[in-house]
């Protein structure tokens, strides 16, 4: 989990330093939207599974949005992705189940992979 957070931090720093138009679609937008969806999912699932992390995953999403500084439609899509992840699991799980724990593990792994891939691809 710490690796995921560190990777997210690296990705956000890389994106802040890249020069591009605010509303132009970046080549990594699909990956950022998926990462936002994962963060939303983790925000809900870790809460019902007793992780006692408070707003940790929401704060990670906020840090991603702040670092990326999307505006207009890009910002709307990023936030919608986070909300889709949260709401999707909220409709499915009311309590922590073995399946919820499996989903958490998978999303932590996928989020770490996306963060690493983005860092490797765009850190130059």
Question: Model segments located where?
Answer:
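Sec/Tat signal peptide C-region and signal peptidase I cleavage site
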Residues: 17-21
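Glycine-centered secondary-structure boundary/capping sites
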Residues: 13-14, 50, 69
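Compact alpha-helical subdomains of small soluble proteins
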Residues: 24, 53-124
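Positively charged n-region of N-terminal signal peptides that target proteins for export
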Residues: 1-4
């Amino acid at each position: 989990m710490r690796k995921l957070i560190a990777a997210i931090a690296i990705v956000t720093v890389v994106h802040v330093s890249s020069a591009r138009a605010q509303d132009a679609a970046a080549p990594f937008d699909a990956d950022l939207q998926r990462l936002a969806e994962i963060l939303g999912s983790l925000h809900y699932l870790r809460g019902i599974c007793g992780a006692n992390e408070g707003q940790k995953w929401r704060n990670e999403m906020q840090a991603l949005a702040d670092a990326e500084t999307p505006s207009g439609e890009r910002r709307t899509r990023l936030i919608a992705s986070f909300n889709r992840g949260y709401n999707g699991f909220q409709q499915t799980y009311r309590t922590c189940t073995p399946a919820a724990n499996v989903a958490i593990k998978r999303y932590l792994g996928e989020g770490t992979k996306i963060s690493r891939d983005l860092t490797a691809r765009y850190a130059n």
